[in-house]
């Protein structure tokens, strides 16, 4: 039995046991992923989707995250200009081994769906959640922009009271951003109300 699946804008004809190099997926080595975009199932009774086969899926195990071979992009302006540029590129890929082709019941398996690079986007809201709990808007202090406020929150200083309570040694120990004495004075005023 074989299946035609779609991932990363490409289509692959696969069987159980095949090893594929697909566009980078948000999964670590050893994890199981499921491709839900199945265009066709083949075998004794072929099924062609319109455009997808309902309930069908292909499960795979992630072997490794790799880079493809280097592609050289060479640009040369001929004749009077005599300029040239060479750039190389190695595409990020995921190596997967097909373990199973499901003809039905794909939504009940509990295996996570294979998606692109969503790991970085998922981490950003998780980092913003601790900042929202019991913190002040540090950008109200003159000279503290959004980037400096974010670095202060990452250093554990998320409120005016925490910034006002810093000693000179603690201020010197903060490497992420240079805390100015005016910031501490303004934080004391804002913490009092």
Curated annotation (Swiss-Prot):
Q: Name one GO cellular component term.
A: cytoplasm
Q: Which UniProt keywords apply?
A: Ribonucleoprotein, Ribosomal protein, RNA-binding, rRNA-binding
The cross-references to InterPro entries, in alphabetical order and at most eight, read:
bL21-like, bL21-like_sf, DNA_repair_Rad51/TF_NusA_a-hlx, Ribosomal_bL21
The family database entries (Gene3D superfamilies) matched by this protein are listed as: 5' to 3' exonuclease, C-terminal subdomain (1.10.150.20)
Q: Name one GO biological process term.
A: translation
Show the GO MF annotations.
Answer: nucleotide binding; rRNA binding; structural constituent of ribosome
Q: What does this chain do? A: This protein binds to 23S rRNA in the presence of protein L20.
Similarity-based family: Belongs to the bacterial ribosomal protein bL21 family.
Q: How does it assemble?
A: Part of the 50S ribosomal subunit. Contacts protein L20.
> Which PANTHER family does the record associate with it?
50S RIBOSOMAL PROTEIN L21, LARGE RIBOSOMAL SUBUNIT PROTEIN BL21M
- What's the name of the protein? Large ribosomal subunit protein bL21
Q: Which gene encodes it?
A: rplU
């Amino acid at each position: 039995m074989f299946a035609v699946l779609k991932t990363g804008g490409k289509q692959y004809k696969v069987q159980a046991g095949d090893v594929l190099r697909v566009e980078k997926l948000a999964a670590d080595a050893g994890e199981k992923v499921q491709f839900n975009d199945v265009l066709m199932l083949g075998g004794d009774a072929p099924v062609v989707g319109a455009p997808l086969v309902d309930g069908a899926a292909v499960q795979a195990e992630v072997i490794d995250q790799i880079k493809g071979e280097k592609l050289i992009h060479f640009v040369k302006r001929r004749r009077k200009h005599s300029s040239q540029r060479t750039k190389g590129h190695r595409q990020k890929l995921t190596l997967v081994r097909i373990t199973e082709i499901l003809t039905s019941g794909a939504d009940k398996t509990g295996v996570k769906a294979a998606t692109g690079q969503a790991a970085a986007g998922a981490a950003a809201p998780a980092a913003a959640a601790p900042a929202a709990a019991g913190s002040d808007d540090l950008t109200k202090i003159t000279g503290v922009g959004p980037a400096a406020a974010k670095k202060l929150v990452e250093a554990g200083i998320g409120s005016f009271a925490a910034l006002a309570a810093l000693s000179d040694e603690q201020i010197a120990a903060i490497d992420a951003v240079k805390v100015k004495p005016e910031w501490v004075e303004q934080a004391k005023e804002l913490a009092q109300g």
